[in-house]
Each structure stands twice: as C-alpha cells, then as structure tokens.
Amino acid sequence: MRVLASAPAKIILFGEHSVVYGKPAIAAAINLRTYVWAEFNERGAIKIEAKDIRVPGLTVSFSEDEIYFESDYGKAAEVLSYVRQAIELVREEADKNGRGITVSITSQIPVGAGLGSSAAVAVATIGAVSRLLGLELTNEEIGKLGHRVELLVQGASSGIDPTVSAIGGFIHYEKGKFEPLPFMELPIVVGYTGSSGSTKELVAMVRRTREEMPEIIEPILLSMGKVVEKAKEILLSDLEEKIRFERLGKLMNINHGLLDALGVSTKKLSELVYAARTAGALGAKITGAGGGGCMYALAPEKQSEVATAITIAGGTPMITEISKEGLRIEEVIP
C-alpha cells in the first residue's frame, strides 16, 4: 500500500512579533505544497527520501542500531528531525512502533524562508503515515499532532504553522486560541530574499528594544494588534472585493512600516516591498520574523508585473493564492 498526502505552506498576513506579547495575528495557507508518499518497508526502519525540497536532496535511513547517510546538503537536513518525529508519533498513536516506513518527499516550499516548510512536511507526513497505518484522524487532530512534533523538535511552538497547514484558509490566532475566518481569494506574490534570519535572535532583539524603550515600543505593538483586528473586520465584512483588497493593502503597508520601526526589516526586504508597490501591488509587507526570508504583495490583476519587479530587485517570486484546503490525501494505492 502507498499513500500520497500534501500540505500547504503558510504566510503570516498580519501580526508577526506583536503576537509574542499577547496581540492577535492572522495567518493563511498558500498554494505552495509539500508532497509525501508513505509506504511500508521490510527492514523495520524509518527511511526518508528527500529528492526535491527546494535545496539539494538527500536520503537517510534510521533503524535501532544504524543510520545511513547517502548524502547531506545543508538546510535539507533540517527536514529530517520533523519527518522522523512525525513518523514515530503516528506509529505510537497507532500502536505500530515496529513497522518499517519509507517516506519520499517533494516540495514547492523553500526551506528556511519562513513559509512553514517544517510544519508542512510534518503535517503531510502525519497525514500519509496515519492513513497507511489505518489511523482515522481529522485535519484538526493532525494539526495538533503537528504541534506536538514542533514541540519535540524545537522545544517551543505557538502551533500556528501546523494548524494553518492542516486546516487551510485563514486562521485568527490570539493567546493560544485559533479561529478559522471566512475564505476569500487573495491574489498574492511571495518574494524570497534568498537568505533567512534567526527568529530567536530577532524576537530577542525586539524584546531588548522594548525593555529599553517601552514607552515607544508598546504603542507600536498596540498599533500592530489593532491592524490585525481591522484586517479581521474586513475579512468578515460583506464589502465588495475591490474595496476589501484596497483596505487590506493599506493595512499591509501600515503593518510593514511598524515592523520596520521595530528593526526587523532588511535592505533586501525593503527593496522587494517597494519594487512590488511600484509595480502596482496594493500592499506589500514582510511575512514572518524578518531579517531575511520573505515578503508578500497583494496584487490583483498585477501578479505577473509584481513578480517581474521582484525578480529585477534580486528576489525570487512565487505567484500564488490562498489555499482553501489544508492537508489533502491525494492518492491511495492498495
């Protein structure tokens, strides 16, 4: 038996950094996906084949007394711990710890870009392996298992990434609580700088600045929280699409300015943001921790022009849209 599952990437639409201080955030799944095939093997080992994960590939086998590294190329290795923990967690849930499982991974999501590649591969792996082992799980349950994987690997996790990847669409998050929001099409372009910042270091930097100048930083964080609530109000409204796009674009630009004030933008991120706006995007901002990684632009009827502008500015564009679906079982071969 073989099972193919897929799970989407995510972007933080609004509220990164301020969410650390109890403010809300809105995230959404996007149509860049990680695909995982799962099947049994006779060796009793966990075997991971990652031949196309937007960095050079690798194949590694784990068993009780041996590890086989056929190749190892930098960031691709980061995938291994998430996949292995996901498989072990599902085998434990299904009470089938001894079964050998091979997973094969392909992905459209660049690793280390702040688009939730680790959560997507964990969620897709859980989806494929749970079906293979006959474990019936809802997408919400799979999202919770994905959160457990992140806690095991990272030691800390809000759960935003695996929840969005499992459920899809828009998610409002505040103080540990998730609320799905109504779906609407958002024609966006993601721009990747080609480098990544350390979320841990950037969060610590903002914290230090807040401790040094609370009277300045607190109002910025408060404003960011209000941006999120205004965006939620727009997503819940029955305004015509054109007006919703325009207002969301304005909020994106405001949110980017506030993030820049916190010091988490970079020259390259700003170049991509302003190139997108000049090319006709209604709004453009950092998504994620900053310091590198990605920005995104809202570009109805201008996606090609914005993508070209991002390329000229030295970024890697990805034309995409919001994914209504989260985890999908794509194929089951008996």
UniProtKB/Swiss-Prot annotation:
Q: Which residues bind ATP?
A: 110-120
Which function does this protein serve?
Catalyzes the phosphorylation of (R)-mevalonate (MVA) to (R)-mevalonate 5-phosphate (MVAP). Functions in the mevalonate (MVA) pathway leading to isopentenyl diphosphate (IPP), a key precursor for the biosynthesis of isoprenoid compounds such as archaeal membrane lipids.
Top-level EC class as recorded in UniProt:
transferase
Q: What is this protein called?
A: Mevalonate kinase
Its quaternary organisation is: Homodimer.
Q: Chief localization class?
A: cytoplasm
Instruction: Tell me which Gene Ontology terms the entry assigns under biological process.
Output: isopentenyl diphosphate biosynthetic process, mevalonate pathway
The entry lists its GO molecular-function terms as:
ATP binding; magnesium ion binding; mevalonate kinase activity
Q: From which source organism is this entry? A: Thermococcus gammatolerans (strain DSM 15229 / JCM 11827 / EJ3)
Q: What are the record keywords, sorted?
A: ATP-binding, Cytoplasm, Isoprene biosynthesis, Kinase, Lipid biosynthesis, Lipid metabolism, Magnesium, Nucleotide-binding, Transferase
Encoding gene (name) = mvk
Protein family membership: Belongs to the GHMP kinase family. Mevalonate kinase subfamily.
Tell me the active site.
161 (proton acceptor)
